[in-house]
């Protein structure tokens, strides 16, 4: 009897220990991931993954940190003050890596897919209606607003010039933020612009300029923005970085099922618009229904060919010495591992 009681006691203790361990595991605190955002619709994957509980399902807690631009995320990514963020692959990014700032491009965040020209070449209405502007060749001698020096939009303008048989320097770039594009076009300070949504739609509604072409028409699939990981996040918290990527890819696939006909008009469109109005700086649901949204690869694939084209442009214009190139800053292993777990993207089928 004593032996039976001892055995029963040991069994009870083991079961109790197992249950306690299970409760402890369930109660384990979530891993915090600090993510840099600019609050625009291009941050949709972060917002969707949070709203849909994809980060929570991976045991992650998202800490969103707002920045004025992606460029300002570079330094904190390198120091570990920021784990992930979104930004453009610019001259500044290449030079930061050259100086020893540790970060990697790990997935697509925005590209100009067919029908999804999130940015456009706008031309003053007066020039179009008068017949002075009819083709890309008519960019010669014009003042074209672009949002900054040493960024992909310079390469975009260069591609537009090439379509007209022109070269860099045949048009005059005028550097100004997107918020300055509407008044500059309205008062004739510039003749044309490379402008992102929603500012592009605002300008067209204002009536000062017309959309000559979406960027997807003259520079298709340009790698416009990317998901960045800081080196400390990669080296010190790789399992967490992989969990983040799984949640990100799930969100990107949900986002893709919101797209149809160059709008957020797919099956998931209403829910994505609802999420964007909650999380982003733009709160107008009706505007989201009419603007052209960005394309994001459902597998997170990075367009290395586009990055190389832009890098070559920066090098040819003397902005880079070429010592650090696209292959030095891209790490596709996280996206590849996440996609391997989910399988190929099938429209309308949630990644689980």
Report residues per predicted region.
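Bacterial N-terminal signal peptides that target proteins for export
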Residues: 1-13
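Short, hydrophobic alpha-helical packing/hinge segments within bilobed ligand-binding/sensory domains
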Residues: 73-74, 92-93, 181-184, 199-200, ...
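Bacterial N-terminal signal peptides
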Residues: 10-22
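Conserved C-terminal helix/tail region of periplasmic/extracytoplasmic solute-binding proteins
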Residues: 308-352
């Amino acid at each position: 009897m004593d032996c039976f009681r001892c055995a029963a006691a040991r069994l009870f203790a083991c079961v109790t220990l197992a249950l306690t361990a299970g409760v402890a595991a369930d109660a384990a605190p979530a891993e915090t991931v600090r993510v840099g955002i600019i609050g625009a619709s291009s941050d949709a994957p972060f917002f969707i993954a949070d709203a849909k509980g994809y980060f929570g399902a991976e045991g992650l807690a998202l800490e969103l940190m707002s920045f004025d631009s992606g460029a300002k995320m570079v330094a904190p990514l390198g120091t570990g003050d920021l784990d992930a963020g979104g930004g453009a692959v610019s001259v500044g990014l290449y030079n930061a890596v050259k100086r020893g700032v540790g970060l990697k491009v790990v997935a697509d965040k925005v590209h100009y897919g067919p029908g999804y020209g999130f940015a456009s070449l706008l031309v003053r209405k007066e020039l179009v209606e008068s017949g002075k502007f009819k083709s890309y060749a008519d960019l010669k001698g014009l003042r074209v607003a672009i949002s900054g020096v040493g960024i992909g939009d310079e390469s975009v303008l260069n591609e537009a010039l090439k379509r007209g048989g022109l070269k860099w320097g045949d048009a005059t770039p005028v550097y100004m933020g997107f918020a300055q594009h509407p008044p500059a076009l309205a008062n004739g300070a510039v003749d044309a612009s490379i402008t992102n949504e929603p500012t592009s739609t605002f300008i067209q509604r204002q009536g000062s300029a017309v959309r000559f072409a979406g960027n997807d028409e003259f520079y298709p699939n340009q790698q416009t923005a990317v998901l960045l990981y800081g080196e400390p996040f990669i080296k010190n918290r790789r399992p967490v970085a992989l969990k983040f990527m799984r949640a990100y890819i799930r969100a990107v696939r949900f986002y893709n099922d919101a797209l149809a006909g160059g709008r957020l008009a797919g099956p998931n469109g209403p829910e994505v618009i609802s999420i964007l109005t909650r999380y982003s700086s733009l709160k107008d649901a009706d505007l989201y229904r009419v603007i052209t949204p960005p394309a994001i690869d459902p597998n997170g694939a990075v367009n290395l060919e586009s990055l190389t084209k832009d890098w070559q442009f920066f090098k040819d214009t003397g902005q880079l010495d070429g010592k650090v190139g696209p292959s030095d800053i891209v790490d596709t292993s996280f996206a590849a591992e996440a996609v391997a777990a989910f399988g190929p993207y099938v429209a309308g089928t949630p990644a689980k």
